[in-house]
Design a protein with these regions (language model features):
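Short helix/loop capping segments that flank catalytic or ligand/cofactor-binding pockets
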Residues: 89-90, 169-170, 229-230
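PP2C/PPM family metal-dependent serine/threonine protein phosphatase catalytic domain
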Residues: 48-61, 125-136, 169-209, 213, ...
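N-terminal entry segment of metal-dependent catalytic domains or homologous docking segments
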Residues: 2-104, 165, 205-209, 269
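C-terminal catalytic subdomain
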Residues: 1-28, 191-280
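Acidic loop->beta-strand submotif enriched in PP2C/PPM serine/threonine phosphatases
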Residues: 61-74, 137-149, 154, 158, ...
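Generic enzyme active-site microenvironment
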Residues: 81, 162, 221
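Short amphipathic alpha-helical signal-transduction/dimerization elements
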Residues: 99-110, 241-245
């Protein structure tokens, strides 16, 4: 392992991982550079990992991604990923606020579909606005939420997002992105939408739905993983698919997923979050 603590090399390695990680002046568990969790219910297997990108580690900054899941009742699962905007100033704090607000809201709702997805997004946006007041733009964050309902055929999924955090279906080694335009927007240099809604003038909210078959995985990713996944169809995509293949059996642990999320790849220095769901 390199002094910079990077995980596996997927593609050309990043030279930045050769530098030792400096000791941060201030660190608390809630702002850890490495986070991982997971578990199983009667209907779902869930694994999540979030790691600070090498750029943040070397500059002594926290991971500015956040994730959460909620299991309000049997057969229902909500999963959320947010990516705080580094240039905003307090993006990591905004991601934490958005995820926490949506998580709490979804634990109490009656319905479980597109309307609830959109309501959770609005609740998250309002929470970020209220926390930041006139400076709410400093808390800017992307946001993606998926509501999963167990069914005999697999699982029904409803999603909503703002920004470039995304969602994929993984079947064996095939990745299908559920929101259109990810790669095209990157090429055009499009302005990324964020919460709070309206802070950038035209933050488009997108929705999607899919039937997740048995054996497939729903994978939510921050752009620190989604971008290299799209750019590396012969490296990152098959390597991550191989890692995730151990999820349903229990062979993949949260710590092993965090190690994979910390892959070394030239030019990829952003924070990375992976949240994967398999119906049982």
């Amino acid at each position: 392992m390199s002094p910079g603590w990077a995980g596996p090399v997927w593609g050309e390695p990043s030279a930045a991982t050769e530098a030792p990680v400096p000791l941060r002046r201030r660190a608390v568990a809630s702002e850890a550079c490495y986070r991982a969790d997971g578990g199983q219910s009667a209907e779902f297997v869930v694994l999540a990992a979030s790691v600070a990108g090498v750029a943040h580690r070397l500059s002594g900054r926290r991971c500015e991604d956040a994730y959460a899941w909620a299991l309000p009742r049997p057969g229902r699962l909500a999963v959320i990923v947010a990516d705080g905007v580094s240039t905003a100033g307090r993006g990591g704090e905004g991601a934490d606020i958005a995820v926490s607000a949506a998580w709490e809201h979804l634990l109490a709702v009656e319905g479980w579909g597109e309307m609830e997805c959109l309501a959770a997004l609005r609740v998250a946006s309002d929470a970020v606005s209220a926390a930041g007041c006139a400076s709410a733009s400093e808390l800017s964050t992307t946001f993606v939420v998926a509501l999963v309902s167990a069914s005999e055929a697999g699982a029904e999924v409803r999603l909503a997002r703002v920004g470039d955090s995304s969602a994929f279906i993984l079947v064996k080694d095939r990745w299908d992105e559920l929101f259109p335009g990810g790669a095209e927007d990157e090429l055009r240099g499009s302005v990324v939408g964020v919460l709070p809604l309206g802070s950038r003038g035209g933050d488009a909210v997108e929705t999607a739905s899919v039937l997740l078959p048995a054996g497939a995985a729903l994978v939510l990713l921050s752009d620190g993983v989604a971008d290299p996944l799209r750019d590396g169809p012969g490296t990152v995509a098959p390597a991550l698919a191989e890692v995730l293949s151990g999820g349903p059996s229990g062979a993949l642990t949260p710590l092993a997923l965090a190690d994979a999320a910390d892959f070394s790849r030239r030019g990829c220095q952003d924070d990375r979050t992976i949240l994967a769901v398999w119906p049982r």
